[in-house]
Amino acid sequence: MKSDIEIARETDLRKIKEVATTLGIPREEVQNYGRYIAKVPIHLIDKKQMDQHNLILVTAITPTKAGIGKTTVSIGLALGLNKIGKKAVVALREPSLGPCFGMKGGAAGGGYAQVLPMENINLHFTGDFHAVTSAHNMITALLDNYIYQTRNTCEGLKEIKWKRVLDVNDRSLRNIVSGLGGSANGVPTETGFDITPASEIMAILCLATDIEDLKRRVGNILLGYTNEDKPFTVNDLGIAGAITVLLKDALLPNLVQTTENTPAFVHGGPFANIAHGCNSISATQMALTYGDYVITEAGFGADLGAEKFFNIKCRKAGLSPKLTVIVATAQSLKLHGGVPEKEIKEPNIEGLKNGFANLDKHIENMKSFGQQVIVTFNRFATDTDEEIALVAEHCEEKGVGFAMNNVFAEGGEGGTELARLVVDTIENHPSAPLQYTYDLNDPIRTKVQKVAQKIYGASSIVYTTLADKKLRQIESLGISHYPICIAKTQYSFSSDPKAYGVAKDFELKVRDVIINNGAEMIVVVMGEIMRMPGLPKEPQARKIDIVDGMIEGLS
C-alpha cells in the first residue's frame, strides 16, 4: 500500500472556497490561507441549526503506544456517511510538532482517510500553535519584567505559578533556572517548560466562545501571589488586551478537506493526558451549524478524553452527543489481555478474549453518561477473521452494536458498514440526555473521588502536601465550582502505565493541583505524568526528510 504522504499528494483537492460552498458557507466569509486552507468567522455559528443536527463522539479503549486510530476512524466515518448520502463533517484537533517528530508521528489520519493538505496540517498549518506559544511566553516575559521592576518594593510577588511553553518534546526543559548571570539579566527563578498543548492559553482558545470571552479568560489567568497572599492575574499586569491581540486570528476555526473532499474543521490541540483533550468548542459548533452529522474525537482512551469531553466541553457548550463510537483493535485488546507488547501483532485468541475486560469497562463508563454506544473494529493487516468474529460476538453478547471498518485501506467505502449502523442507531436508539460524573457544586476532592472511582475504578486517593496546599488556595479563591481535568498516564486506568487491562484495588496519588483560572478548570496531576514529554530512542524525526523540495517520511 502507498504511504500516507503519497496518497495525500495523489488526491485531487478542491479549492477551499468550493469546499465551503458545499456546506453553505458564503464564499465572501472564507478567509483563505492558500488554496486549500481557510479560517471561518465565529459569527456564522447558528445555535438553532446546531440543535437540529447530530453530534457523534469517537473515542477508544486504552491505546497502545502506537495509538489506536481514532482520528483515522473519525475521518473514515465522515467519508462513509457521505458515501451513503448523508451530509457529514468531521471536527478534529490540530497536530502538535512534539509527537509529530517524536514517537507517534503526525495526527492527520492515515491511508485513504486523511485530512489534507497533511504536510501543512502536521507542520505549521495556520500558525495557531505558534500564536498560543507566543501569547503564553509573552505573558512570561512581561511577568518577569514586572518581577524585575518591583523586586525591591512591596508590590513584588512571592509565588509564581506561570511557566513557559514550546511545541517540542524536550525533557531537559522540564525544570530550569532562569535569570542567571547577574542582576542585569533578571531575577533568578526556578521554573520550566510545558509543551504547548498543555498551555492554559490552548485550553482557553478551545473553550472561548468569542473574542470578548477570550479576553475575559486571558485576563483571569492566575500568575502567582503577592507578598500579601493576594492572587495576581494577567489583568493585574494590564496586558489582557495585548495577549488577546496575539490570539485574534487563532480563535477562528480552520476549514480543510479529507481525501474524498469531505469538509473538516481542524482547530485547537490540547492533549487528553495532560489537558482536556478536545478540539475547540467553536469548531464543533461551526461543524454542527453546517453538517447534518458531525463526528468529533477526544484524545486517548475514553477514561481520559471522553470523560473530559462530557464533563468539561459538553457541559460548557451545552452539547449532547447522539452516539458514542468506541474504537478497538486486536493489538490493543491483546496488550490488555496480557500479551507482551512485542507479540501483539501475532494471532492470540486467548489474549484477545482476556482484553475484553478493558473494552467492557470503557463501554460501562460511556453508558454512565447516558450514551448509546457502538464498537467499531479498526482493521489492521495482521488481524485474522477469527479475531474479528470474536469481537463481534462479544459485543452482541453485551448488547452493543458492532461494525467493522477498513477506512485506512478503502476510504469511505470501508466505512459504510459503520456509517449505516451509526445512522440506524441515532434514528432508532439515540443517547439519553447527558449525565455528568459529578456536580459542579461538589468539593474538588469529591469530584476527584467520583471520577477516580467511577471511571478509573480506584479504591482510594491520597494527596501530597503540595496538593493539599493548592486545594486550600482553591477554597480561599472561591473557585471550587470549576470542573476538574485529571492529568495522568494514558496507558492504564491507574497511574501506573504498565497496569494493563483493568486495574483493581489501586491507590491514586494526587501529586499536584494546578489552577487554570482563565480556562475555568482545576488540573489534578496524578502519578508521574509529565506536562513536557521526552523523545524516544528512535524519534520520528529520523524518518523525515526533504528531497528535491518534496517532504518524505511524514505520516
From Swiss-Prot:
Source superkingdom: Bacteria
Keyword Nucleotide-binding tagged: yes
Record: residues binding ATP: 64-71
Keyword ATP-binding assigned: yes
PROSITE patterns, alphabetized: FTHFS_1, FTHFS_2
Extent of the signal sequence: none
UniProtKB keywords: ATP-binding, Ligase, Nucleotide-binding, One-carbon metabolism
GO BP term, pick one: tetrahydrofolate interconversion
Pfam families assigned: FTHFS (PF01268)
Listed pathway(s): One-carbon metabolism; tetrahydrofolate interconversion
GO molecular function: ATP binding; formate-tetrahydrofolate ligase activity
Catalytic activities: (6S)-5,6,7,8-tetrahydrofolate + formate + ATP = (6R)-10-formyltetrahydrofolate + ADP + phosphate
SUPFAM superfamilies reported in the protein's UniProt record: P-loop containing nucleoside triphosphate hydrolases
Record-listed E.C. numbers: 6.3.4.3
Similarity remark: Belongs to the formate--tetrahydrofolate ligase family.
Classification via NCBIfam families: PRK13505.1
Protein name: Formate--tetrahydrofolate ligase
Lineage: Bacteria, Pseudomonadati, Bacteroidota, Bacteroidia, Bacteroidales
Encoding gene (name): fhs
